[in-house]
């Protein structure tokens, strides 16, 4: 069971002209940086979607969920397995699987929360930005789900 890190480079975070949060974001699974170590993308949009999808996955509403990056056709696919940890599949354009591994879903969820918190705290004066509001709401929902899942164990 592998631990997946979600990396957001705070030094690269900026607001685009359309008031979207952009910067370097990628995941680290084993020694692989995916899509790449310097992947520049719309961080807040990505994390907002990931928070929602992972929450649904943890609640058992989805057996399979895809977590997308905004630029390019790169995805992280979470697949529920019977009596095992979920499988994460990293796919590049044309659905080419470059890696898959069983992951610690609790750790991954907490990594998404930590990355989201970085963005929220990096732009305290911009809480009116839609993406940041969405992240804040989704963070609260995922935290509640993680508490509920941990109580059930």
Question: Each predicted region: which residue ranges?
Answer:
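Short, surface-exposed linear segments at secondary-structure transitions and domain or protein termini
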Residues: 44-52, 87-88, 110-113
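A short, sequence-level motif marking secondary-structure junctions
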Residues: 39-46, 81-84, 105-107
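N-terminal low-complexity, intrinsically disordered segments
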Residues: 1-58, 62-64, 69
